[in-house]
Amino acid sequence: MGRLEGKVIVLTAAAQGIGRASALAFAREGAKVIATDINEAKLQELENYPGIQTRVLDVTKKRQIDQFASEIEKIDVLFNVAGFVHHGTILDCEEKDWDFSMNLNVRSMYLMIKAFLPKMLAQKSGNIINMSSVASSIKGVENRCVYSATKAAVIGLTKSVAADFIQQGIRCNCVCPGTVDTPSLQERIQARDDPKEALKAFLNRQKTGRFASAEEVALLCVYLASDESAYVTGTPVVIDGGWSL
């Protein structure tokens, strides 16, 4: 029997990167996975895997989220993954950049939690996992101003939800990766003026000499989604290869 046998898991940003790796890892451990993303074409690739059903969802749209939540009868785990990495200092961050990042990286989690938490409370059990980052209140990182601000907010949101509902059977934790080799990272590297130098700079700050893989982060997410972590709540769980040391 899998470590997540019988659990219903809803996750966002499942079409690629950590979201995709986690959806596959959850399904392998026996969960019924409801994988959502705004990218319908990429999302459909998951439909070939047993235990995974897909749903196109824009997590910045409250009406879509509320409609989606109304269709879900049971949920054991909510995994909020959706996010965007803005490059630059505060001087490079226009108001529209700030608003976009806050909307996608923080408000979407607020909307998802608010939509699904009442179902968990009615069940008297529930598990929420939010994607944060080491680039947050944990570590100051150059050229990650608004991104770090949003991910620090995610840590605060996580702790608040955990504290408010701990006695009602709800757990809430967040995952704080360092640099992970994902399509998003590769896109950011290629967008730089000198991609080779950008890749070198990313690698030079890795104390292990390499990036994390999405699959490594997904294994941590399996643990947090499972009953093995039943005594863990309100915790920012770091997986960064020692970058924050």
From Swiss-Prot:
Localization terms from the record: Cytoplasm
CDD domains xrefs: DHRS6_like_SDR_c
Residues that hold substrate according to the record: R144, R188, R205
EC number in record: 1.1.1.-, 1.1.1.30, 1.1.1.104
Keywords from the named record: Cytoplasm, Lipid metabolism, NAD, Oxidoreductase
pH-activity dependence text: Optimum pH is 6.5. Active from 5.5 to 9.0 with 4-oxo-L-proline.
Similarity annotation: Belongs to the short-chain dehydrogenases/reductases (SDR) family.
Name used for this protein in its record: Dehydrogenase/reductase SDR family member 6
Species whose genome carries this gene: Rattus norvegicus (Rat)
